[in-house]
């Protein structure tokens, strides 16, 4: 059995920043993640996706953000337990005991749940033969955008992923059709402004008021996408790639059985320190819910800092935290994290 100060569930960007924050406060960390590598959705779903709202980075690829966060956390020697899930929780006095799907046992004073969307998968559009085209012409995630160079692409959706990828791929695609059932997009206003600016050229055509209706092609190769409006008028879009971005299915898995207050696949927390209804267990990032919550990586970073400062007295048996700015602290030499 391992003994540590903090167990962090989730090795996405918010979980990795929590490792750094814990280290700055002198807390030892173990990190559990179901994926084979650290990085969460940033690595498994969209490593090349540009992120625009990280301070000091006008634009940074998701993969590069994870690389920098891992470097930032490395001096504190976190131990990563990858390709396994946290499945059982037992409370013993002032400690928690966590068991993973690989029978790893970890004893900890504090738990930080930074599991993002939990177990995730794409929300697929209800098209009869879509499986015939998946992985060759239909993709739900992008990990190598170069494969779309010179293609005619239909992107479906109106949120950040749909809009950001339309902008990003417009540099290399032959033609992009962005299909959305409404006239208004829910992406960041600046992204929508960029989208509409590019749409003034022939690179992106906005198909609003329409939804996906059917796919046409042969041998898993898409030839066209049929879209339909509310009056059942159809339009045929010549395309060889479909990218549906309708969000992710969320599943908390075993976390839902831990006695936490859960609402609509999110964990309810207080809005001051992001503690759950169980003292010593915190939830941060996209998995956490409170009034006024913003689902931003930046917000998750702030939640990590607040929750771990609050957890300090629990880890160190009631000792008061003497606050210091990071410029007064010595994080030590760079070292390598350990993966179990």
UniProtKB/Swiss-Prot annotation:
Reactions catalysed, as given in the entry: 2 reduced [2Fe-2S]-[ferredoxin] + NADP(+) + H(+) = 2 oxidized [2Fe-2S]-[ferredoxin] + NADPH
GO MF, one annotated term: ferredoxin-NADP+ reductase activity
First-level EC class: oxidoreductase
Key word Oxidoreductase present: yes
Alphabetical UniProt keywords: FAD, Flavoprotein, NADP, Oxidoreductase
Subunit organization: Homodimer.
Protein's recorded name: Ferredoxin--NADP reductase
């Amino acid at each position: 059995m391992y003994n540590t100060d903090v167990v962090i569930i989730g090795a996405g960007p918010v979980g990795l920043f929590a490792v750094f924050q814990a280290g700055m406060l002198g807390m030892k960390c173990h990190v559990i993640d179901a994926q084979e590598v650290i990085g969460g959705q940033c690595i498994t779903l969209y490593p090349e996706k540009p992120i625009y709202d990280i301070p000091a980075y006008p634009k940074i690829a998701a993969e590069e953000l994870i690389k920098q966060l891992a470097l930032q956390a490395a001096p504190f020697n976190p131990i990563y337990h990858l390709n396994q899930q946290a499945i059982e929780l037992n409370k013993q006095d002032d400690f928690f005991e966590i068991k993973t799907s690989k029978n790893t046992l970890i004893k900890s004073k504090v738990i930080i749940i930074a599991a993002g969307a939990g177990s995730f998968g794409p929300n697929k559009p209800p098209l009869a033969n879509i499986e015939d085209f998946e992985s060759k012409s239909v993709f739900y995630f992008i990990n190598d955008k170069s494969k779309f160079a010179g293609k005619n692409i239909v992107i479906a959706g109106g949120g950040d992923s749909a809009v950001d990828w339309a902008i990003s791929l417009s540099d290399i695609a032959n033609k992009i059709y962005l299909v959305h059932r409404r006239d208004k997009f829910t992406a960041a206003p600046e992204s929508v402004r960029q989208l509409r600016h590019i749409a003034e050229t022939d690179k992106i055509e906005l198909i609003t008021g329409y939804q996906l209706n059917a796919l046409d092609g042969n041998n898993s190769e898409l030839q066209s996408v049929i879209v339909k409006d509310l009056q059942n008028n159809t339009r045929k879009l010549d395309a060889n790639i479909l990218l549906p971005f309708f969000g992710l299915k969320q599943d908390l898995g075993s976390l839902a059985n831990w006695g936490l207050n859960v609402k609509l696949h999110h964990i309810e927390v207080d809005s001051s320190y992001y503690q759950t209804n169980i003292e010593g267990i915190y939830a941060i990032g996209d998995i956490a819910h409170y009034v006024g919550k913003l689902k931003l990586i930046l917000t998750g970073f702030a939640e990590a800092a607040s929750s771990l400062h609050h957890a300090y007295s629990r880890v160190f048996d009631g000792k008061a935290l003497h606050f210091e700015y990071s410029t007064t602290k010595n994080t030590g030499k760079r070292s390598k994290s350990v993966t179990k």
